């Protein structure tokens, strides 16, 4: 079963600024190395669906639904195809904001996804190492955008 993954970064900008960058979902391709496009279907809030195009060896579409939307504090979406939850926690600090990105898989992944990870993505350990590197890259780019 996939384990929770987490990455954190300190950003020299207030939570409101980080939130504005993070929740402008059309900008997600600027930050995430695997996201080609993320299009919200309506206003960005809890319950909103997104249509996404991703790239990791090959291009593939996904959909997600925003499951947590607490301005300046917490944001999360659940990927419908593999049931993973990607979340972001914002915490005010003396120097700005601590931003934490997490990937949780509370119900495991469906069998076709498991087969894809094992056969096309090098197995769970290699895949998770790749995901953590992508999370760190995403956070670094969000930091750069928020500190401008």
What are these regions (language model features)?
Residues 1-42:
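Hydrophobic ligand-binding cavity/cleft-lining segments
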Residues 12-15, 19, 125, 129-132, ...:
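Short amphipathic alpha-helical segments with heptad-repeat character
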Residues 39-85, 93-98, 133-148:
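Glycine-rich portal/gate segments that line the openings of hydrophobic small-molecule binding cavities
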Residues 79-133, 142:
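Beta-strand/loop substructures that line and gate deep hydrophobic ligand-binding cavities in soluble
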